[in-house]
C-alpha cells in the first residue's frame, strides 16, 4: 500500500503547483545563497588576506605531490598548504631592482601599479625545481625555485645564482594576459615580446632546440591577441603527433568583421615543429587557428553572440585524445552585459582543422573558403610516420610552407556541443571570469559540477543534468557563495580532487572552500534529495557526503529527477499526508482596517510559496488569491486593511520540483477596531495607572491603529504623556491670591527651554514678576509694553532694576505655597493638543513674531 500513498502524494504534488498560475518556475536561481560571513561562521571558508605591499594573486601552480599550492603575486612567491592555506605559509620576496624601477618610471609607467615584479610564469621544471618568471618592472626576468624532492625536505628558496632574460616567456606589462606551458624542458608561451606591447607571438624557448615563434607583424597570424590557456592534447597513440592547443582572443582580421570586433580563437601547432628550411626559418610551420563560436540561436537566424573568451577548462576523459573543453565567454557590448559557458568536443575541433582554409584574393575582397589545390602533406599535419612519412618540418616541400604562411586561418568556426551554451546569464550584476569543473560519481551516473567565478568575488556551483539526451541539458544552480570580503574579480581558480577543496585568487588575496557543504541543505531527507547535489546523499540520519564505494543501502540520492517521494521512506509511512504535524502553529493578532505581514520564507530560493486559509469551524482550505489587497513577497504575505473574514489559520507551503513541503501554520485573529477604541478610551479616562496588559495592548497596536475618535497622533500622544506623567498625589493648580481665580501654568517656549537648564541658570533667566499681587499682568495679546524716550522706543525690560529681579525670584518661590490653598481644577482635552503643536512649531523657529508678541513682559 505504500506505493499507492506515494502515487497519491505525487498526484497532489503535481496538481497543487498548477494552481500557482501567476508564478513561473524560478530558473537560473541558486538554491542556496551564502554570504561571506555565513561562509566564515559555518567554517566553510579560509582566507589569506595577503600582504600590504603585494597584490595580484592570480598565477597558480598545484603541486599535489608535496601538497602545496604555489602562488605568484607582486614582488612575492607564496607556498600554501593544500589542507589549510593559513597553516605553514611560506613566502619569498622577489622585488624588481631599484635601477629597473627607476627606468620603468622614467619610461612613463605608473611606479606603484606597473613598476614591480609581477610573477606571471610558474611551471614545474623537474622533481626539485620550479621555473619562475616575472615582469621585472617592464624588464622580464626568470629564475628557478628549489622545492626539494619530498615535502619533508621543507625547502623553498629562490636560486640567487641563476637569472636570465625573460623576453618571450613573461609579458612586459603586468596587465597583459599571457599563458605558458612547460613540457619536456621546453617552455611554450603566448605573450608580448617588446616594451611597447606590439610584438605578440607564440614562443618555444628553453631546451636544446633553437627558439621558435610565430610570424612577426602579420595580422593574419596574430592580431593583438590575449592568451588564456595552453594545453597538450594527443592526436594519436604516436607521441610524434602530439599537438599544442592555444586558446586566445584577438581583434578581427581585416575584412573578417565590420568595424573593430573581438574574435575568440583556438590555435594548434605541432609539438615537434622545428620551423622551415628556406621559408619560415625558426617560425612555426604547422600553426593554424579557428574561430570559437558561442551564441544563442535567435529568430530569423539572428543569434546573440558571446564574443570574448575569458577562461578555458579541459575535462579529461577516459580517452586522453578526446577531452571535453569548457569555455567561458562574455559579451563585448557595454550596453548588453552577459556571460555564457559553452562545451566543445575534440572531434568537432579536428573536423574544422581538416576543413577549408580561409582565403581572400586582396584587401578589397571577402574571406571565402579556399577552392584551389591544397598541397601535400596537408598544412598543419605533424611530421611523423603516421601521416606522410616526413621526419621533420624542415623536410616539408616549399609549397606546403608557402601555403601555411599565407593561410593560417580556417574558414569554418567551431560550434559548441548542442549548438548553444549550457549556461547563460544576462541582466545580472556580475559576469563570469573563471571556471573549473569536477566530474562526480553519483548514484545514477556521472555529473560535471562547474564552479564559476565572477567579477564580484562570488562563486556559482552549477550542475548540468541531461533530460532526454546528453545534448539536452538542464542547468541547476546549487549554490552562490561570496568568498571575498569585498567585491573583486576572481582571477585564478584551482581544484584539488584529492583534498576536495577549491582555491581562488584575486587582488585581495587567496580563499579556500570545500567542494561540498551537505549539512547546509537541511535536516530532512526531502531537503537533501531536492538539493540535487551529486556530492551529497541522505544516509538515514543526515545529509552527508556521498561515496560510491560505500555499501550502505540507506543512501538516498536522485540527481536526475530530484524526487523525494521515491527516495524518502518517511514520506510514505507518515499518516499525516500534509505534513503539518511537524509544523508548530503560531498565533498572531491584528487590528481591523490595519495591515499585517505573515512571514514565511523557504530555505531554498528555487521554491515557490503557496498560501491557503482555513477559516474557523471549517475543515476546508481555501486558496489565497493575490489581488490589490493581498501581496505576495519573497519573505511572506502582506495583507492590507484587515477584515474579520481574514481570521483563521494561514498555511504556508513551499513548492519545489513538484514536491510540496509545509513551512508555517499561522493562526491570525483579527481584533475589531471598535473594541480597541473602547480599551483606549477607557484607559484615557481612568485616573489610575493602566494595567500592564493595557500598556502592552497599546504598544502592540499603536503602529497599526487608525481609530476615528483620535483626530491626530498629537492628541493621542498628549493623552499618553499626561497619563504617564501624572504624579501619585494630586496637586492643585496655581491660584491668584487676590482674586481666587486659578491660573494655568502656561509656559512659553523660552521658559520651556529654560526648564531644561540647571537650577542656577533657571534662576538667572527667570522672568521678572513684581512681588505685589495687585500688579496688573498684561495679557498675551498686548505684546511687549514700550515707553517713549528721547532716544527712541525702548523696551521696558531694559529698564528693570536689580531689586526687581530679587523680588521676582522671591515671588516665584512663594507661588507654589500659595497655589496649594486654591481649589483643584484639572485640565484635559484639546487645549493641551493645541499648545503642544504651538510649542513644537516655536521650537522649530516658526511664528517667531507671534511668539515675541505673546511672551509676557519680564518687568513692569
UniProtKB/Swiss-Prot annotation:
State which residues carry a glycan (glycosylated): 53, 126, 593
Q: Using the chain's own numbering, where are the disulfide bonds?
A: 104-115, 133-142, 270-382, 294-342, 518-536, 652-717
What InterPro entries does the entry give?
A: Ig-like_dom, Ig-like_dom_sf, Ig-like_fold, Ig_sub, PSI, Semap_dom, Semap_dom_sf, Semaphorin
Q: Which Pfam families match?
A: Sema
UniProt-annotated stretches for the region Disordered: 725-860
- Indicate the secretion signal residues: 1-17
GO BP, sorted A to Z: artery morphogenesis; branching morphogenesis of a nerve; cell migration; cell migration involved in vasculogenesis; motor neuron axon guidance; negative chemotaxis; neural crest cell migration; positive regulation of cell migration
Instruction: Report the residue ranges that make up the Ig-like C2-type domain in this protein.
Output: 579-668
Molecular function per GO: chemorepellent activity; neuropilin binding; semaphorin receptor binding
**Which residue windows does the record flag with biased composition (Polar residues)?**
748-764, 782-818
**What's the family?**
Belongs to the semaphorin family.
What is this protein for, i.e. what is its function? May influence outgrowth by a variety of growth cones including those of the posterior lateral line ganglion.
Q: Name one GO cellular component term.
A: plasma membrane
Question: Where is composition skewed (Basic and acidic residues) in this entry?
Answer: 838-860
Tell me where it resides: Secreted
Keywords, alphabetical = Developmental protein, Differentiation, Disulfide bond, Glycoprotein, Immunoglobulin domain, Neurogenesis, Secreted, Signal
The record places domain Sema at 31-515
Q: What is this protein called?
A: Semaphorin-3aa
Amino acid at each position: 500500500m505504500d506505493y499507492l500513498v506515494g502515487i497519491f502524494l505525487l498526484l497532489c504534488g503535481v496538481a497543487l503547483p498548477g494552481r500557482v498560475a501567476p508564478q513561473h518556475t524560478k530558473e537560473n536561481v541558486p538554491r542556496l545563497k551564502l554570504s561571506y560571513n555565513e561562509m566564515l561562521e559555518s567554517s566553510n571558508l579560509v582566507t589569506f588576506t595577503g600582504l600590504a605591499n603585494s597584490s595580484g594573486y592570480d598565477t597558480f601552480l598545484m603541486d599535489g605531490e608535496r601538497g602545496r599550492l604555489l602562488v605568484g603575486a607582486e614582488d612575492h612567491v607564496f607556498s600554501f598548504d593544500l589542507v589549510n592555506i593559513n597553516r605553514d605559509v611560506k613566502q619569498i620576496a622577489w622585488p624588481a631592482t631599484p635601477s629597473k624601477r627607476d627606468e620603468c618610471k622614467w619610461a612613463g609607467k605608473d611606479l606603484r601599479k606597473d613598476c614591480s615584479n609581477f610573477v606571471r610564469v610558474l611551471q614545474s621544471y623537474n622533481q626539485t625545481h620550479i621555473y619562475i618568471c616575472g615582469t621585472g618592472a617592464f624588464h622580464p626576468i626568470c629564475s628557478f625555485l628549489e622545492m626539494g624532492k619530498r615535502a619533508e625536505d621543507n625547502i623553498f628558496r629562490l636560486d640567487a645564482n641563476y637569472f636570465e632574460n625573460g623576453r618571450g616567456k613573461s609579458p612586459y606589462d603586468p596587465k597583459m594576459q599571457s599563458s605558458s606551458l612547460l613540457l619536456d624542458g621546453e617552455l611554450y608561451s603566448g605573450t608580448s615580446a617588446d616594451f611597447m606591447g606590439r610584438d605578440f607571438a607564440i614562443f618555444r624557448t628553453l631546451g636544446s632546440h633553437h627558439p621558435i615563434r610565430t610570424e612577426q607583424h602579420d595580422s593574419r597570424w596574430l592580431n593583438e591577441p590575449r592568451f588564456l590557456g595552453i594545453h597538450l592534447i594527443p592526436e594519436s597513440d604516436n607521441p610524434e603527433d602530439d599537438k599544442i592547443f592555444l586558446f586566445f582572443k584577438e581583434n578581427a582580421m581585416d575584412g573578417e568583421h565590420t568595424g573593430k570586433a573581438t574574435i575568440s580563437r583556438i590555435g594548434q601547432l605541432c609539438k615537434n615543429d622545428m620551423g622551415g628550411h628556406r621559408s619560415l626559418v625558426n617560425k612555426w610551420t604547422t600553426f593554424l587557428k579557428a574561430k570559437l563560436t558561442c551564441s544563442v540561436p535567435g529568430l530569423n537566424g539572428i543569434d546573440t553572440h558571446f564574443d570574448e573568451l575569458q577562461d578555458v577548462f579541459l575535462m579529461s576523459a577516459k580517452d586522453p585524445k578526446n577531452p571535453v573543453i569548457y569555455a567561458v565567454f562574455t559579451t563585448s557590448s557595454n550596453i548588453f552585459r552577459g556571460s555564457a559557458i559553452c562545451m566543445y568536443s575534440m572531434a568537432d575541433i579536428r573536423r574544422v582543422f581538416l576543413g577549408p582554409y580561409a582565403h581572400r584574393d586582396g584587401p578589397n575582397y571577402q574571406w571565402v573558403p579556399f577552392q584551389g589545390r591544397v598541397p601535400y602533406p596537408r598544412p598543419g599535419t605533424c611530421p611523423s610516420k603516421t601521416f606522410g612519412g616526413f621526419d621533420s618540418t624542415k623536410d616539408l616541400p616549399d609549397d606546403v610552407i608557402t601555403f601555411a604562411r599565407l593561410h593560417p586561418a580556417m574558414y569554418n568556426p567551431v560550434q559548441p556541443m548542442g549548438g548553444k551554451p549550457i549556461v547563460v546569464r544576462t541582466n545580472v550584476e556580475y559576469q563570469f571570469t573563471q571556471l573549473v569543473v569536477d566530474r562526480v560519481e553519483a548514484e545514477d551516473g556521472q555529473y560535471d559540477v562547474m564552479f564559476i567565478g565572477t567579477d564580484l568575488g562570488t562563486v556559482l556551483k552549477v550542475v548540468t543534468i541531461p533530460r532526454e539526451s546528453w545534448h539536452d541539458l538542464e542547468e541547476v544552480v546549487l549554490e552562490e557563495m561570496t568568498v571575498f570580503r569585498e567585491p573583486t574579480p576572481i582571477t585564478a581558480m584551482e581544484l584539488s580532487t584529492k583534498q576536495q577543496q577549491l582555491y581562488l585568487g584575486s587582488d585581495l588575496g587567496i580563499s579556500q572552500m570545500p567542494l561540498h557543504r551537505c549539512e547546509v541543505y537541511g535536516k530532512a531527507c526531502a531537503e537533501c534529495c531536492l538539493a540535487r547535489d551529486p556530492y551529497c546523499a541522505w544516509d538515514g540520519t543526515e545529509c552527508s557526503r556521498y561515496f560510491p564505494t560505500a555499501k550502505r543501502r540507506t543512501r538516498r540520492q536522485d540527481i536526475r529527477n530530484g524526487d523525494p517521494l521515491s527516495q524518502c521512506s518517511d514520506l510514505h509511512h507518515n499518516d499525516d499526508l500534509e505534513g503539518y504535524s511537524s509544523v508548530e502553529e503560531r498565533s498572531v493578532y491584528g487590528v481591523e482596517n490595519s495591515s499585517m505581514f505573515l512571514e514565511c520564507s523557504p530555505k531554498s530560493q528555487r521554491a515557490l510559496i503557496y498560501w491557503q486559509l482555513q477559516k474557523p469551524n471549517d475543515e476546508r482550505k481555501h486558496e489565497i488569491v493575490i489581488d490589490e489587497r493581498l501581496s505576495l513577497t519573497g519573505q511572506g504575505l502582506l495583507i492590507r486593511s484587515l477584515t474579520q473574514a481574514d481570521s483563521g489559520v494561514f498555511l504556508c507551503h513551499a513548492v519545489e520540483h513538484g514536491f510540496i513541503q509545509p513551512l508555517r501554520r499561522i493562526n491570525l485573529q483579527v481584533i475589531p477596531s471598535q473594541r480597541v477604541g473602547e480599551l483606549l478610551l477607557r484607559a484615557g479616562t481612568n485616573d489610575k495607572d493602566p494595567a500592564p496588559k493595557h500598556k502592552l495592548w497599546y504598544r502592540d497596536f499603536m503602529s497599526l491603529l487608525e481609530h476615528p475618535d483620535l483626530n491626530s497622533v498629537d492628541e493621542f500622544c498628549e493623552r499618553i504623556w499626561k497619563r504617564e506623567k501624572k504624579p501619585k498625589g494630586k496637586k492643585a493648580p496655581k491660584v491668584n491670591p487676590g482674586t481666587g481665580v486659578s491660573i494655568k501654568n502656561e509656559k512659553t517656549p523660552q521658559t520651556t527651554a529654560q526648564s531644561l537648564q540647571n537650577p542656577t541658570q533657571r534662576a538667572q533667566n527667570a522672568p521678572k514678576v513684581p512681588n505685589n499681587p495687585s500688579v496688573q499682568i498684561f495679557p498675551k495679546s498686548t505684546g511687549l509694553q514700550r515707553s517713549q524716550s528721547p532716544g527712541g522706543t525702548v523696551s521696558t525690560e531694559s529698564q528693570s532694576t536689580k531689586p526687581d529681579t530679587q523680588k521676582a525670584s522671591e515671588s516665584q518661590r512663594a507661588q507654589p505655597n500659595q497655589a496649594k490653598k486654591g481649589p483643584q481644577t484639572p485640565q484635559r482635552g484639546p487645549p493641551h493638543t493645541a499648545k503642544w503643536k504651538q510649542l513644537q512649531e516655536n521650537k522649530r523657529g516658526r511664528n517667531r513674531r507671534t511668539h515675541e508678541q505673546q511672551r509676557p513682559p519680564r518687568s513692569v
